[in-house]
Amino acid sequence: MDPETCPCPTGGSCTCAGSCKCEGCKCTSCKKSCCSCCPAECEKCAKDCVCKGGEGAEAEEEKCSCCQ
C-alpha cells in the first residue's frame, strides 16, 4: 500500500490506485500526475493530469510534467 497520505483538502478522491484529484496528493502509485499547470493545448496533460492552481507567469515556470 502507498505509504504517502492524501487528505484531499480541496475535495475529490485519491485512493492511491487510479485517482488523483487532491491538491496535496503525494501518492507515488497514483496513475495520474498532479500538475501545477496543464496547458489546454496539451491533450495528454488534460487527459492524465489533475491541475492544481497556478496561472500566468507562475504557472509558466511550473510546466506540466506530462507535456515533457
UniProtKB/Swiss-Prot annotation:
Brain. The modification N-acetylmethionine is found at residue 1. A divalent metal cation 5 binds at residues 35, 37-38, 51. A divalent metal cation 7 binds at residues 51, 64, 66-67. GO terms for molecular function: cadmium ion binding; copper ion binding; metal ion binding; metal ion sequestering activity; protein kinase activator activity; zinc ion binding. It holds the Pfam family Metallothio. InterPro entries: Metalthion_dom_sf, Metalthion_dom_sf_vert, Metalthion_vert, Metalthion_vert_metal_BS. Residues 1-30 are annotated as: Beta. A divalent metal cation 4 binds at residues 34-35, 45, 49. A divalent metal cation 6 binds at residues 38, 42, 45, 67. Residues 31-68 are annotated as: Alpha. GO terms for cellular component: cytoplasm; inclusion body; nucleus; perinuclear region of cytoplasm; synaptic vesicle. A divalent metal cation 2 binds at residues 8, 14, 16, 27. A divalent metal cation 3 binds at residues 16, 20, 25, 30. The modification Phosphoserine is found at residue 33. Keywords: Acetylation, Copper, Metal-binding, Metal-thiolate cluster, Phosphoprotein, Zinc. GO terms for biological process: activation of protein kinase B activity; cellular detoxification; cellular response to cadmium ion; cellular response to copper ion; cellular response to reactive oxygen species; cellular response to zinc ion; detoxification of copper ion; energy reserve metabolic process. Belongs to the metallothionein superfamily. Type 1 family. Binds heavy metals. Contains three zinc and three copper atoms per polypeptide chain and only a negligible amount of cadmium. Inhibits survival and neurite formation of cortical neurons in vitro. This is Metallothionein-3. It comes from Sus scrofa.
